[in-house]
Amino acid sequence: MQKRTLGNSARELATIGLGCMGLSEFYGPPTEQAAAIKLLHEAIELGVDHFDTAEMYGMRSANESLLGEAFADRRDRVFIATKFGPTRDWETGMATGIDGSRENCRRAVEGSLQRLGTDVIDLYYLHRVDPATPIEDTVTAMAELVAEGKVRYIGLSEASGDTIRRAARIHPISAVQSEYSIFARDIEADVIPACLEVGASLVAYSPLGRGMLSGRFKNETLGENDWRSANPRFQGEAYAANVALVDEIEAVAAAKSCTPAQVALAWVIGRGEHVLTIPGTTKMENLKSNLGAYEVLLSAGEQTTLDALADRVMGDRYDESGMAIING
């Protein structure tokens, strides 16, 4: 199990963690509780120690509650990251805005601590930057939580390079979470240089392009309640073109006797020691297969082939409303 240091901390984590959102929402019906807990326990046994959740994942923060139950007797073996900022109407599930105020930060952390069944959150992110609250004010509030022992490290998610630098002047930023994959490389010009400058790890979410890079969408359609159906990269002409691009990833995988998903993950973790990643899955076989990416070493020629794909991807990585709240 490959380990890397979390940003400017002394904490070492498995390079490949587990994004837990899909266990509770967004990719179809929630996974049955017992099955979800079994998968989380198996992940620990396989050497995964970094688990990512958020207040907004699952109705009434069900994903945090799931992790709290799963890790109740295993807390010393796991590193839990959660996030605050986006707000939802829990009667309808609809998003209602972003609140990075001190008041919301303190309200949210107390709820997360309770649901997670812990007295300290290992890594606490601002999930999206609140345009109405100066980042300095939000990070000051988050730093108070560190001083009070409620949070160990703080991070930002989908923040711009300028915001990262401003935040780091207030308190060390240990991690920046952004979408990063063979198909999503827009952060390389601004966000990654800022991470390196302030000593933050890049935590890459959706390293498999929301499943597209696994190659399985050639034979599957999106299920009911799958939010990807509203994602521009999964619609119409763009969907067909993007799925066709995966052929080139599959060719690399065939030559290396591995899976396309393993190639995609190897590409991400091969970008540097500052990169951690949190692929999500609801299936035990995918969990085990993803960890096989540690054994995949890409040649310079393979890297060049894969690097060229991003410029040919069609569609934004979120719909218009989603694009409006990234790179804040």
What are these regions (language model features)?
Residues 11-16, 47-49, 75-78, 118-122, ...:
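Short, well-ordered coil/turn segments that N-cap beta-strands
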Residues 187-223, 259:
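Aromatic-lined glycan-binding groove of carbohydrate-active enzymes
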